Each structure stands twice: as structure tokens, then as C-alpha cells.
Amino acid sequence: MAAGALDDFQHAAALVLRTPTLIWIFLGGAMVTFAVNGLIAWGVSFMRRIHGFSVEDIGSNFGIWALAGGVLGALFGGRAADWLQQRWPGGRVFAAGAGFVLGGPVCVALIMVDDLRWFAPLVMATYFLYTWYNGPLAAVILDVVPPAVQASVLGAFVLFSHLAGDALAPPLIGYLSDRTGSLRTAMLLLPAVGVLGGAVILIALRTVGRDMSRVHA
């Protein structure tokens, strides 16, 4: 069974390297995963150290608003992606990448804001935009690979995005915080990488139509 799983992974990796859309999705997906999960990992420490929030404050000002924004963003992103896809082969790619390009400035505002009246709305807006990608990105992967290997390629994407993305974010932000003496400054890396990742995903707009046609030919 282990040998079969390894063979499946190797086949999935070879398919990724032969499919331009998947290359952009894998690279961009790792970057946006870095941004999202870095924000989650350091959010509590940020609010306690920068704003002096208590545990109760964090629950009401971060958890609830982030959850609400994330749920609404995932639903909106999926619906918008499907609506666009009916009119344009790049619809799902656009929805997956656009949320991070639009969300980058909002996340910067969240990190830099001192007026706490804006904090909860910015948390919700950031997570709303940062969760558009969840459904569309997986759907793009399924759109450009044969049905026989869809699960293997999707599994390879999840593995790659975690190893190259969110596994790196917490220690790197911690290191930069120690080096700069400012957690706020260190966390500005997250929206920067998120915008870059969104832009990399959007490069797949140039290739997704051709890759979809090849699968369905």
C-alpha cells in the first residue's frame, strides 16, 4: 500500500509539472496559505502584545468576527466563482486570486490600525476576502486533471501548500519579530506574501482554458 501511495504521488507530481495551470496554483496556493495561517497563528499574540486584549476580548474581537468573515467569504467566493465560470473559463481562477489581491491592503490596515473601533470590522473584512479561495482553488485543480488522478493531485496540493506555506509562517514571523523588535512590523510580511500569491494564481488565467480543453478533449 505504501508503494502504491508513493507511485500515486510521483504520478501526481509529474502531472503537475506538465500542467502550467497547476504550477501556478501550487506556487500561489502555498503563498496564500502562508498568509492566512500565519495570521491565524500569530493573531492572538498580536492582539495581546499590541492592543493589550484579554482572553475574553480576543474571543469577541477576533474569533467571532474572523469566523463570521471566513464563513461568508467561503460561501461568497464559491458562488462568485461558479457564476463567473459559467461565463468565462478563468472564473474560478479569478475568484481564487482576487481575494488576496484585494485583501492585502485590508490586512495591512488591520495590522496597523490603532483605533480599536475599526479592529473588529477589519478582522471580518480580512477573513472575508482571505477565504474566497477555498472552494475555487480546489475546483480549478479538479478542472485541469483527469478524473482518475484528481484525489492524488488534490492531496499533493494540500501537502505542498502546508509544507511550503503555513509550516513556514509561524517560525519566520517569530524570527522577524525578534530581529526587528516589532511583531507588527514582522506581520506585515503576511499580506505582502498574500498579494504576491494572489497575483501568481492569477497568472493561471493565461493557461487554464487550454489545460481544461486538453482534459476534456
Where are these regions (language model features)?
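A late C-terminal transmembrane helix in Major Facilitator Superfamily
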Residues: A74, L142-T180
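Flexible cytoplasmic inter-helical loops of multi-pass small-molecule transporters
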Residues: M1-H11, M212-A217
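Multi-pass alpha-helical transporter architecture, strongest
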Residues: G104-V113, L188-A217
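Interfacial helix-cap and linker-helix signal at transmembrane-aqueous boundaries
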Residues: M47-R48, A80-A81, Q85, L172-G181
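Membrane-interface helix-entry/capping residues at the boundaries of transmembrane alpha-helices
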Residues: G59, A96, L154-G155
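C-terminal transmembrane helical hairpin of 12-TM major facilitator-type secondary transporters
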Residues: P89-L137
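A membrane-interface helix-boundary motif in multi-pass transporters
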Residues: S54, G91-F94, Y175-G194
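Extracytoplasmic gate region of multi-pass secondary transporters
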Residues: R18-G77, Y130-A138, L142, G165-P170
